[in-house]
């Protein structure tokens, strides 16, 4: 398994520039903390900070358990999987409120440009997670990931740099 992981990381490095994240002790400009969550215009609705209508509607349709027209922080924390494959989403602003998210599928989201998963400490970077997201130009990974799945960033032609946490082997 370790050989496959090493070969996969080597393959990523050929197509995308990578750099290891440095510990906050060695580099005070790069703290080992997640990015701040966006402000919530409606403190009772995590979707109120989302700037992508398709992502927002997906969340209302799938996670508004009590059907009050809002996705509360409690409802968001119960979400373990978000499947956005082949959706025309551009950003995932607000995804950090889904604190127990384990599985994210953005395969073939050709319009997706930026993703910040630094607050999603349980998410796994699975196989083909961002497969052919050709406009993806920036991604922030959680500092605690241990491995990156096969072809996770295959076809992400706009992605020129990924900071890979030190724990990834």
Label for each model-derived stretch:
Residues 11, 22-27, 38, 121, ...:
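Intrinsically disordered, low-complexity serine/threonine-rich segments
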Residues 18-103, 119, 143, 166:
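N-terminal capping/linker segments that flank leucine-rich repeat
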Residues 10-11, 15-17, 106, 126, ...:
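Small side chains
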Residues 127-131, 149-154:
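Consensus positions within tandem repeat domains that build extended binding/scaffold surfaces
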Residues 6-7, 152, 166:
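Intrinsically disordered and other compositionally biased segments
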Residues 89-103, 110-124, 134-147, 157-169:
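Structural signature of tandem-repeat unit edges
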Residues 1-28:
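Bacterial Sec-dependent N-terminal signal peptides
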Residues 18, 47-49, 109, 133, ...:
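Disulfide-bonded cysteines in secreted/extracellular proteins and peptides
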């Amino acid at each position: 398994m370790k050989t496959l992981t090493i070969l996969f990381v080597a393959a990523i490095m050929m197509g995308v520039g990578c750099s290891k994240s440095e510990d906050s002790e060695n580099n005070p400009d790069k703290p080992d903390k997640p990015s701040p969550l966006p402000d919530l215009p409606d403190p009772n609705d995590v979707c109120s900070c989302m700037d992508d209508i398709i992502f927002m509607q997906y969340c209302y349709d799938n996670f508004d358990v009590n059907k009050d027209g809002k996705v509360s922080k409690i409802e968001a924390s119960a979400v373990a999987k978000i499947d956005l494959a082949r959706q025309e989403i551009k950003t995932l602003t607000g995804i950090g409120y889904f604190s127990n998210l384990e599985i994210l599928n953005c395969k073939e989201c050709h319009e997706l440009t930026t993703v910040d998963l630094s607050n999603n400490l349980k998410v796994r970077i699975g196989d083909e997670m961002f497969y052919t997201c050709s406009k993806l130009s920036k991604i922030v990974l959680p500092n605690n990931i241990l491995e990156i799945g096969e072809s996770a960033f295959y076809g992400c032609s706009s992605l020129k740099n990924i900071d890979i946490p030190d724990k990834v082997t």
